[in-house]
Amino acid sequence: MIWIPITLAAAAFQVARNAAQRSVMGGAGPWGATLVRFLFGLPFATVFAGVAWCVTPGPSAHASAPFWLACIAGAALQICATAAQLTAMHRSSFALGTALQQSGLLFALVWGALLFGDKVSAMTWTGGLVATAGLAALTWPRGGTPMRRGAVTAGLASGAAFALCANCFRQASLTFDPAHPAMSALVTVMVVQALQTLALGGFLAVRNPDALVEVVKAWRRSLGAGFCGAAASGLWFTAMAMSPVGQVRAVGVVEMPLAALAGRRLFAERLTAVQMIFGLIAAVGVAMAALG
């Protein structure tokens, strides 16, 4: 059960990373802010992977074609998911953007059943539907809540893409070295972030060089986002190498109250009592899905 505290730590680092990324969103835009976590996270991910490789007894690496395919697919999906999540946060609020991303639980169930042949119980499906209903009510536009056009669509797209890339990363980690999940996960993070840095950095260099300039200007804040992003990814990948994605995502719902606290302290955002109630309903649904 060590994957549970690992997941809790991953959720905390992820909230810190999202807050740091959101702070550079204005000048760099969603794609520039997305590059922050990969470009400035890669040095930290490389150090983490190197240390893990050195301290792992008898590592047996298998960088096979399925490993590279899973890494490439997951990397592309995560880039799109991160940009969609930041767009949702920018058009609504930090906490609501994070809550919308949690719709990835239901998407994870759908992808698992359709693409990976997962056998899903009735309780798990019910929990997924309850969680989705709670999130829909939580994020429904209200008079006192700023919600610009496209926020919900971007948030749901983020959840769908994150759910699919999580399964890709789990497959990559298990393929690389299933006997050493932590080391395998950290090496996978390094490879994925290198691919993402090259792909997104090259894209911005050609299409939007001004965004690259803004990212470089915000290097102090970006270093914090990079470290937190590399730490969060390493912990998430490790937990998913030890346990199914659905269970990890269920425990990771702790990210929602953490995001609400962060949004209140850092961005002066507040959730209403009704939103908090529906947030709890969503959390109950997530727990049902995990325990089903």
Predicted regions and their residues:
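Hydrophobic transmembrane alpha-helices of multi-pass small-molecule transport proteins
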Residues: 45, 109-116, 123-141, 274-291
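Alpha-helical transmembrane segments of compact multi-pass small-molecule transporters, enriched
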Residues: 39-45, 100-114, 195, 199, ...
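Hydrophobic core positions of alpha-helical segments in small-molecule transporters
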Residues: 9, 36, 100, 123-126, ...
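Membrane-helix interface motif
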Residues: 50-56, 164-177
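Membrane-interface interhelical linkers
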Residues: 1-73, 80-92, 133, 141-160, ...
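Small-residue-mediated transmembrane helix hinge/kink sites in multi-pass secondary transporters
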Residues: 22, 86, 112-113, 170, ...
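Membrane-embedded alpha-helical core segments of multi-pass
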Residues: 13, 17, 77-84, 104-111, ...
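Membrane-interface helix-loop-helix junctions at boundaries between adjacent transmembrane segments
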Residues: 85-123
